Regions:
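Helicase-associated low-complexity/disordered flanking segments
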Residues: 1-62, 267-298
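Conserved segment of the helicase C-terminal RecA-like domain
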Residues: 344-347, 351-354, 359-404
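Non-catalytic terminal extensions of ATP-dependent helicases
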Residues: 302, 321-322, 405-814
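A short beta-strand element within the Helicase C-terminal
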Residues: 152-155, 327-352, 381-387
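Conserved interdomain hinge at the start of the Helicase C-terminal
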Residues: 224-250, 257-260, 314-323
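Conserved C-terminal RecA-like helicase domain
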Residues: 91-93, 101, 108-117, 252-327, ...
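Conserved P-loop/Walker A NTP-binding site and adjacent catalytic elements of P-loop NTPases
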Residues: 35-222, 226, 244-270, 304
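Conserved two-lobed SF2 helicase motor
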Residues: 128-144, 299-313, 319-339
Length: 853
């Protein structure tokens, strides 16, 4: 058996992965695993858990259709342990990266760092480990590329109800159809009737499928429909001891609005607030939203949604797991397996916007959310509350005010639902409670990428694609359509000479690629090959070369929708002001306004190039370009992360911006060939790395620190603070660019004569609005204007003194201002606090001045 330091308390009970003998018998595996469960975890397993693990040890597939909180994770642990003991590589798949990441760290804790890896398309950690956590698409693409040769011994598919998702369901169905020698554990609390799934899996693998769907809910639920305002509902729950409460919203803005409202109503006790303050003592809330979150947390109110920085989201989860937060306001991401233990779920609505229209919640969606109520081991029951629509709450308030006075009751004017409003009532709630999750309707699609993955496997790819369609759980009409789509794709690939065939001796055909394909082309940035081709259109001698390369990279990235909406809103506001000044009539202003959108650099060039590329490279038809300017905008305006958030008023979406910058960094660093990089591009790549790491390094840091701390408050602090630096300056080039950008941004603001903005930036180091007003008055007495062109931004006008880097952890900097007369007698000077700057991602000064030499 292996040592616990490297392999965790459970991993140490299995043979090391590199040992020759890894074939422990099933009885011994059972004894070791359940001995660990009782002795180390201190848990008494339920009968359905023992049954499921015995079925897995017998070699059967298991469909675990049991309620939330019924211990599905323990069964998955048993499967991973059995795989380790028998020399098989096991996989855990989930629909979202956050859940994959959470499970990765959970498994590292019990199996050890050496035994667990993670692959999410943009993150690869220990990818050769015997236990792999990944998104469903990662496994599906591997199954298509490798088929039954894939080194996939067994798979735990979490949230298997996603197989019914119209866009992504194919990724849950494909492995079941293409990995006949793999053992599957399919898990969800809301699968509904699974007979068809079990029959299909048994038919495809010739292996028994055991369905476990009779496990009792460990914590029963009670339900309430209320006409009370939300604040009163939360207050009553707090008084009755029905905390912690998760208030479910269907938009991020609504979640924050409620959190800020509840923070002023006293939802926590003095003792709770003191405990929270102690737990977050070491946490650095460096961003605009971070400061909002800090205020909320100190009142006992948490917030949780996908627009937050990952480190803040995981901090809230950790505080909730410690039982420190009485109330969390969040979105319905709660229903996707995120580990936030709660007693009560309060739904602010029974409708949601699904991307096209408002509609009522489906039974599966409702049970996914409601099922999170009730903490096993703490609660005897969980509470699910649904709020009535706001107009009904107002009506109830008016009726209550009238009391039992018939005359007053007669005068009450009842409000009606707003026009077009999708409403709900007590009956809606009752039906959702009683309704079983809808029977899953599996989805399948055929794309160029899927076909090319099959061709990569070798052999008769066409036959395998036809079999994939025929074996799928689709209707005959759907299968016919899929076959037609496959015909189109294969014909296009033949016409463009991307694939060829070779006849075998037995008369069959082998398919092979006739072009070089990038590794993992369908997993990471699928348009990387287009980017490489498009770069040839640019002139490296052009002054705009670096910015245009950035624009080409950005066009291949997923849109950060909240950021682009903010850009569009600002552009339209500015255009409206100009049109009013020009005297345009209202109707004409409205017509022109519809044509204004966010910046799309190189749009015409890129569209023409991509049209040609799709003709030459057919698999590109699965994707599309989306020109935009976020990184370019930040570079051109010398913006840092905080300044950009402030400029577009997108503090609520800073997590979205960070993810986008992280994607841009990876694409620039991985995809653009070295011979296409100039010094400015290398500067931008280094700068992006510093920004991304300093704003949120939680994933890398938690991996590096996994298992290193048992102290809860220390662990919480580590999630919200940058990682320890091996040297005073970790990335010299990136940090230099960050500082130069910050100083030149001030030069740009001097050109615009913005003392208020400059004062807000520099008041902390003694240069507030009044100081800047005096400096600007003196400057413009001597010079007519400030230059902000490329020459003004050049390295010749920036001075850096590093002599106190090691002893004082500081740099002295000087940005010379390129004035209208070319005197260069004015400058911004300062001493940089290197530690604070690197930890916050924005420049922090020890001292600062605007000087006239």
């Amino acid at each position: 058996m292996a040592d616990t330091e490297h392999y965790g308390s459970l991993g140490a009970l299995a043979p090391a992965w590199d040992e020759g003998e890894r074939n422990i018998d099933t009885d011994e595996i059972y004894e070791r695993f359940f001995g660990w469960v009782t002795d180390v975890k201190g848990v008494e397993p339920w009968p359905h858990q023992e049954e499921a693990i015995m079925d897995l040890l017998a070699g059967d597939h298991v469909i675990l259709n049991t309620p939330t909180g019924s211990g599905k994770s323990l069964v998955a642990l048993g499967m991973h342990f059995a795989a380790l003991c028998t020399g098989r590589r096991s996989y855990y798949t989930a629909p979202i990266k956050a859940l994959v990441s959470e499970k990765f760290f959970d498994l590292v804790e019990v199996f050890g760092r050496d035994n667990v890896g993670m692959i999410t398309g943009d993150t690869h950690i220990n990818a050769d480990a015997p236990i792999i956590c990944c998104t469903a698409e990662i496994l599906a693409n591997q199954a298509l590329r490798e088929g039954r040769r894939a080194d996939v011994g067994c798979v735990a598919m979490d949230e298997f109800h996603y197989s019914g998702d119209s866009e992504r369901g194919w990724a849950w169905q494909v492995p079941l159809l293409t990995l006949p020698d793999t053992q599957f554990l399919l898990m969800s609390a809301t699968l509904g009737n699974v007979d068809a799934i079990a029959d299909k899996l048994e038919d495809m693998t010739d292996t028994d499928v055991d369905v476990i769907a009779d496990a009792p809910r460990p914590v029963p639920l009670t339900y309430e429909y209320t006409l009370d305002p939300l604040e009163k509902t939360v207050e009553l729950a707090f008084r009755k001891g029905e905390t912690p409460i998760y208030v479910v919203h269907f938009s991020q803005d609504a979640a924050l609005d409620t959190a800020q409202s509840l923070a002023s109503t006293g939802v926590s006790s003095k003792e709770q607030r003191q405990a929270i303050a102690e737990a977050i003592k070491g946490v650095k809330f460096t961003t605009a939203f971070g400061k909002i979150l800090q205020r909320l947390l100190r009142t006992g109110v948490g917030i949780h949604h996908a627009g937050m920085l990952p480190r803040y989201r995981r901090l809230v989860e950790q505080l909730a797991q410690q039982g420190l937060l009485p109330v969390i306001c969040g979105t319905d991401t709660l229903g996707v397996g995120i580990n936030v233990p709660i007693h009560s779920v309060v739904l602010t609505a029974l409708t949601k916007f699904d991307g096209t229209k408002m509609r009522r919640l489906r039974a599966r969606e409702f049970h996914q959310i409601a099922g999170r109520a009730g903490r096993m081991g703490f609660d005897t029951e969980g509470l699910v509350v649904a709020e009535a629509p706001e107009y009904e709450i107002e009506n109830a308030k008016a009726v209550a005010k009238a009391g039992n006075d018939p005359k007053k009751l007669k005068k009450v004017k009842r409000k009606k639902a707003p026009e077009g409003f999708v409403t709900w009532n007590q009956s809606t709630f009752d039906k959702l409670i009683d309704a079983a999750p809808e029977t899953l309707v599996p989805h399948m699609k055929i794309t160029h990428s899927m076909v090319l993955n099959e061709v990569t496997q070798g052999g008769d790819a066409r036959r395998r694609v036809d079999e994939l369609i025929d074996d799928s759980a689709q209707t005959p009409d759907q299968k016919e359509h899929l076959h037609e789509r496959a015909d189109e794709i294969f014909q296009t690939l033949f016409d463009t000479k991307v694939i060829e065939t070779e006849e075998r001796d037995d008369g069959g055909l082998d398919y092979f690629l006739d072009v070089d394909m990038p590794d993992d082309f369908a997993l990471d940035q699928p348009l990387s090959p287009f980017l490489l081709a498009a770069l040839e259109l640019l002139d490296p001698e052009s002054d705009m070369y670096a910015l245009d390369v950035i624009s080409m990279v950005e066009a291949t990235l997923e849109d950060p929708k909240q950021v682009l909406r903010a850009q569009e809103r600002q552009a339209r506001d500015a255009a409206m002001i100009r049109m009013k000044e020009d005297g345009l009539e209202y109707d004409e202003r409205m017509d022109r306004l519809q044509e204004i959108t966010y910046p799309k650099p190189l749009e015409d060039m890129l569209d023409a190039a991509f049209d040609q590329y799709r003709h030459d490279v057919p698999w590109a038809n699965d994707y599309w370009l989306s020109p935009k300017s976020v990184v370019r905008d930040m570079v051109e305006t010398a913006s840092d992360f905080t300044g950009y958030i402030s400029r577009y008023n997108i503090a609520r979406s800073e997590g979205t911006l960070l993810r986008y910058l992280s994607d841009a960094y990876r694409a620039l660093a991985r995809t653009v060939p070295d011979d296409k990089l100039d010094d400015q591009l290398r500067d931008v790549i280094s700068w992006l790395r510093v920004v991304v790491r300093s704003i949120d390094s939680s994933l890398v840091d938690e991996w590096e620190n996994a298992g290193a701390s048992d102290d809860a408050s220390q662990a919480a602090a580590s999630l919200a603070a940058p990682g320890a630096k091996a040297a005073v300056v970790e990335d010299r080039r990136g940090l230099t660019v960050l500082i130069r950008n910050a100083l030149f941004h001030r030069v740009q603001l001097m050109d615009l004569d913005k003392p208020e903005t400059l004062g807000a930036l520099d008041k902390e180091w003694g240069y507030g609005v009044h100081e800047w007003e005096d400096a600007l008055d003196d400057f413009y007495d001597e010079h007519e204007y400030v230059n902000t062109d490329a020459k003004a931004r050049s390295a010749e006008l920036f001075m850096l003194d590093e002599k106190h880097e090691n002893d004082e952890h500081s740099w002295h900097v000087r940005q010379i201002i390129d004035d209208s007369d070319g005197d260069h007698d004015w400058a911004i000077t300062g001493t940089i606090d290197l530690d604070a700057t690197q930890s916050s991602g924005e420049v922090v000064f020890f001292d600062y001045a605007v000087t006239n030499d």
